[in-house]
Curated annotation (Swiss-Prot):
Organism: Homo sapiens
Topology in membrane: Single-pass type II membrane protein
Primary localization class, coarse: membrane
Gene this protein is translated from: IFITM2
Annotated protein name in UniProt: Interferon-induced transmembrane protein 2
Side of membrane Cytoplasmic, spans: 1-56, 78-106
Record note on what altering Y19 to F/A does: Loss of phosphorylation. Accumulates at the plasma membrane. Increases infection with influenza A virus and SARS-CoV-2. Increases anti-HCV properties
Keywords from the named record: Acetylation, Antiviral defense, Cell membrane, Endosome, Immunity, Innate immunity, Lipoprotein, Lysosome, Membrane, Palmitate, Phosphoprotein, Transmembrane, Transmembrane helix
Length: 132
């Protein structure tokens, strides 16, 4: 590894460096500081944080695969995908609307799926007991 050492010596040794005054600095020096009677105004910018919109895709996929009562799980999955698409585009209001519909459909699919599962267990038991 080669190290090159360079030393720089000032050209005008013993004399202060000659500075050029910029035009703006010269105007400020001649005119002085501006005197405004009004206080300086400030601008406030509100940046909205990323609003988290749940799209319920996993829940819809579960209902589609396991409890697809009256195709509610599949329809909920379609609305969940639409909600995710709206969220990616930046349309938070549209994403919330589709997510709300997907949530309602998922709730109904879950309730009807549980109800039908219970009926599929109870009805054969009752039929077997009635035959005895």
């Amino acid at each position: 590894m080669n190290h090159i050492v360079q030393t720089f010596s000032p050209v005008n040794s013993g004399q202060p460096p000659n500075y050029e005054m910029l035009k703006e600095e010269q105007e400020v020096a001649m005119l002085g500081v501006p005197h405004n009677p009004a206080p300086p105004m400030s601008t406030v910018i509100h940046i909205r944080s990323e609003t988290s919109v749940p799209d319920h895709v996993v829940w819809s996929l579960f209902n589609t695969l396991f409890m697809n009562t009256c195709c509610l799980g599949f329809i909920a999955f379609a609305y969940s995908v639409k909600s995710r698409d709206r969220k990616m585009v930046g349309d938070v209001t549209g994403a919330q609307a589709y997510a709300s519909t997907a949530k309602c459909l998922n709730i109904w699919a879950l309730i009807l799926g549980i109800f039908m599962t219970i009926l599929l267990i109870i009805i054969p038991v009752l039929v077997v007991q009635a035959q005895r």
